[in-house]
């Protein structure tokens, strides 16, 4: 696909400074050629502006003079994404409902849906208009899938799960498996039935092989606009707010409540029955064992406030040397005590 820079600027509301020309794709500053657009969002790559061969660069206004052709943006990274969408190849071209799909007679599939071979749609399930179900998807009985959704291969929605409009579920996502509920008894470990469900809002994206368990009672929820990375685990009865960013390998234990606009970096672990306030940021590999008030930034295991965490990071590399010095001081102190004792 070939587009003129003036066309892209018009579509995205950007200012074109320099020669109007045709481009056919998007690439990094380092790899882009004369027929490609690039972008600068991270100051770390400022030096590449002078060496890039890109036909045009999406930049903030203060850097427009540093390139021959600029698309001036208030948010270069976001507008890079919008530009990329103009050139991105659509995944899949199947239309209609495959004869190799199994659709229960009581299920309802909306207009314009693409249901690939080897999809199963159970009794009373409802699929919204324009939704795409890739091969191997399992939609259990009484599930509701909104309009404009994309479910990539082998996504599983167990019975009664609901997802809103315009959601993207990547390969291997499982929503509505039983929560981890067991009781120790004199007869061994006994299962507690998990009879609730999972409800996902609209405009939610969930990464590959992420699992969100059904609740014991009630609903496990994820709010509108939240984005969840690959390999994340949400336990039963978790309530997650809107517009959260949850990075890979996060685990949130059962019945924890997470507010809106929360960010959890990679490998964060959150204990159960906690409250994480809106606007909280949790650093990577943190272990959260107590409630966090709204707006806080925390890190570490156990998680502490940012200033304490940063001081801890500063001290940690010095500990081996401090340990040696402490041992030496203890030895000198013992010798001094012995000397004083002998003098008495």
From Swiss-Prot:
Pathway annotation: Bacterial outer membrane biogenesis; LPS lipid A biosynthesis
Catalytic activity as recorded in UniProt: a UDP-3-O-[(3R)-3-hydroxyacyl]-alpha-D-glucosamine + a (3R)-hydroxyacyl-[ACP] = a UDP-2-N,3-O-bis[(3R)-3-hydroxyacyl]-alpha-D-glucosamine + holo-[ACP] + H(+)
GO biological process: lipid A biosynthetic process
E.C. numbers: 2.3.1.191
GO cellular component, one term: membrane
Active site: 236 (proton acceptor)
Family annotation (InterPro entries): Hexapep, LpxD, Trimer_LpxA-like_sf, UDP_GlcNAc_AcTrfase_non-rep
Subunit relationships: Homotrimer.
The family this protein is said to belong to: Belongs to the transferase hexapeptide repeat family. LpxD subfamily.
Protein name: UDP-3-O-acylglucosamine N-acyltransferase
Organism: Nitratidesulfovibrio vulgaris (strain ATCC 29579 / DSM 644 / CCUG 34227 / NCIMB 8303 / VKM B-1760 / Hildenborough)
Lineage: Bacteria, Pseudomonadati, Thermodesulfobacteriota, Desulfovibrionia, Desulfovibrionales
């Amino acid at each position: 696909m070939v587009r003129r820079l003036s066309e892209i600027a018009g579509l995205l509301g950007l200012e074109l400074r320099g020669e109007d020309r045709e481009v056919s794709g998007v690439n990094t500053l380092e790899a882009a050629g004369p027929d490609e657009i690039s972008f600068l969002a991270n100051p770390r790559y400022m030096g590449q502006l002078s060496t890039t061969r890109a036909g045009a660069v999406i930049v903030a206004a203060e850097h427009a003079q540093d390139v021959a052709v600029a698309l001036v943006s208030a948010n270069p990274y976001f507008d890079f994404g919008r530009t990329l969408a103009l050139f991105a190849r659509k995944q899949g071209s199947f239309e209609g409902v495959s004869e190799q799909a199994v659709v229960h007679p009581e299920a309802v599939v909306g207009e314009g849906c693409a249901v690939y071979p080897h999809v199963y749609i159970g009794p009373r399930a409802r699929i919204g208009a324009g939704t795409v179900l890739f091969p191997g998807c399992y939609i259990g009985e009484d599930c509701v899938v909104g309009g404009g959704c994309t479910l990539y291969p082998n996504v599983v929605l167990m019975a009664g799960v609901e997802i809103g409009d315009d959601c993207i579920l990547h390969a291997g996502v499982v929503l509505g498996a039983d929560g981890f509920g067991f009781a120790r008894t004199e007869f061994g470990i006994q299962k507690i039935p998990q009879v609730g469900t999972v409800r996902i809002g609209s405009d939610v994206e969930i990464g590959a092989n992420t699992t969100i368990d059904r609740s014991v009672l009630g609903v496990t929820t994820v709010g509108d606009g939240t984005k969840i990375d690959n390999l994340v685990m949400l336990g039963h009865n978790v309530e997650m707010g809107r517009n959260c960013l949850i990075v890979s390998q996060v685990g949130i234990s059962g019945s924890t409540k997470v507010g809106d606009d929360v960010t959890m970096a990679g490998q964060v672990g959150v204990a159960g029955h906690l409250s994480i306030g809106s606007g909280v940021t949790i650093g990577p590999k943190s272990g959260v064992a107590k409630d966090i008030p709204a707006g806080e930034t925390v890190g570490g295991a156990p998680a502490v406030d940012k200033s304490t965490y940063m001081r801890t990071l500063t001290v940690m590399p010095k500990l081996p040397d401090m340990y040696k010095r402490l041992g030496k001081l203890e030895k000198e102190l013992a010798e001094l005590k012995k000397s004083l004792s002998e003098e008495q």
